[in-house]
A protein has these predicted regions:
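Alpha-helical transmembrane segments in inner-membrane proteins
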Residues: 1-452
């Protein structure tokens, strides 16, 4: 019933090819039509999910495949896209059965089809990004009035100090005996959370400034997913000893892929984000495949993916703190680029900045920070997204002040998430990354709702 309704709406959907300004000039109002089309698409997705489960990436890969084949008319795409989606899903289902039989002696379950579908879809999107040039659109950033940046920094630092104080004791009073008992177990995890928050927040400030996308975050580059994929390869090849080298190799692979495809588009912000999302989806599907395989080693990957801080080691904590300190010291070197690059390539070149070199350097810096934080606490989400917005909400408008405030807020978010995860379900612990994502999801929805 829903499919014929979608075909009926096809004529009205042809209006979407015209800009909203032109439609308003003609007196047409497509708000009701857009709402109806979205409702039909949502109902179709609900029926499919309720019937066979979550199937990812088919809705994105099928239209992209049709566009790549040169099919342009809406009527032809409405017929060809479902056929392409059916072929993709049939191939994924066949691959699931073949792999399950081939690995029957190593895995205990049949591989889910929904886990396999993003793998060819992500590879297809990467191929299309390689073949096509994405035009550069200068990032649009609203002019924000500089409202007393010093109080914003003070508030952020006070919040960080209070969160750290409570992390070493659930009260503000701590005797010498209690401190001696708690210090060895608490300081590595608190320092790890603090350092990871600083690195993710600084990376988020750079990405949002570079792309002009308020929803940009370190996870959008695919570095975290690449590190996770490297951890899986390390587990399969060398056990625990190869985890670090595998994570580093995976993060470097993700960064290299983003750089290679981004270089073809002169490091246009849109190409960087799309490449990161595509590789992140591809690597995330492989990680899910490992977790769903039933391999006992998958529990290590599952625990790492939750963003735990309770496994922090002193040496790893000190290493992360050193990298975070270097990031804070090197961040002022990029302030001129962060002020000029949002103006666009032509204006940046006129002001003496080489955009390609500047963007490559900034992306390499972000990749290092994201990779180190991922090694420390796993793929923590929302910290790099929320911290820059909290800084801007307090009046930190310039890149320099915003970076300082965001670093303090990023550290505060993860330190408080670690503290709350330790107390909410005592004596059990909730990983800080999972709790940060749980608390950050409403903020993310609010941010989407207020964005224009």
């Amino acid at each position: 019933m829903l499919v014929p309704l979608a075909l009926i709406l096809m004529r009205g959907m042809a209006l979407f090819a015209v800009s909203d300004e032109s439609l308003r000039g003609l007196g047409a109002n497509t708000s009701g039509l857009r709402l109806t089309v979205l409702l039909v698409a949502t109902l179709v997705s609900v029926v499919v999910t309720a019937r066979i489960g979550v199937i990812g990436f088919v809705g994105l890969a099928a239209p992209l495949l049709i566009n790549g084949l040169g099919i342009r008319s809406l009527s032809a795409r409405m017929v060809a896209a479902p056929a392409a989606g059916a072929v993709i899903l049939l191939l994924a289902d066949g691959a699931s059965q073949v792999l399950s039989r081939a690995l029957s002696g190593q895995i205990a379950i049949v591989l889910p089809t929904g886990v396999l579908t993003p793998i060819p879809g992500g590879a297809m999107l990467l191929l299309l990004l390689w073949q096509r040039r994405i035009p550069e659109h200068p990032p649009r950033q609203a002019l924000v009035r500089n409202r007393r940046p010093l109080p914003a920094v003070v508030v952020a630092l006070i919040a960080l100090a209070i969160s750290v104080a409570f992390s070493f004791s659930e009260t503000l009073h701590l005797s010498g005996l209690d401190a001696a008992e708690l210090w060895p177990g608490r300081w590595p995890r608190v320092l790890t959370a603090l350092s990871a928050g600083v690195m993710l927040a600084l990376a988020g400030v750079v990405i949002q400034s570079l792309t002009g996308n308020p929803l940009g975050s370190p996870e959008s580059l695919g570095i975290s997913s690449g590190a996770g994929l490297g951890i899986i390869l390390g587990l399969l090849s060398g056990g625990m000893a190869a985890l670090f080298s595998g994570a580093v190799a995976g993060a470097l692979l993700a960064f290299a892929l983003v750089v290679v495809i981004g270089a073809r588009n002169r490091f246009a912000p849109g190409a960087l984000l799309l490449t990161g999302v595509a590789f992140g989806t591809f690597a995330g599907a492989l990680i899910s495949l490992m977790i769903a395989s039933g391999d006992p080693r998958a529990f290590i990957v599952l625990a790492w993916s939750m963003g735990p801080t309770y496994r922090a080691e002193p040496m790893a904590a000190l290493t992360g703190a050193a990298v975070a300190l270097l990031a804070l010291l090197s961040f002022p070197l990029f302030l001129r680029w962060l002020r000029i690059l949002p103006l666009g390539t032509a204006q940046a070149q006129a002001l003496g900045v080489r955009p390609v070199i500047a963007r490559f350097t900034l992306m390499a810096w972000v990749a290092v920070l994201t990779g180190v934080s991922t090694l420390a606490v796993g793929p923590v989400s929302f910290a790099g997204l929320m911290a820059p917005h909290l800084a801007r909400a307090l009046g930190a408008s310039g890149p320099g002040i915003q970076g300082i405030c965001a670093a303090a807020w990023g550290a505060t978010i993860l330190v408080l998430a670690d503290l709350a995860g330790r107390l909410i379900w005592f004596p059990y612990e909730i990983p800080a990354g999972a709790l940060a994502s749980l608390l950050g999801a409403p903020f993310f929805l609010w941010l989407i709702g207020r964005s224009r």
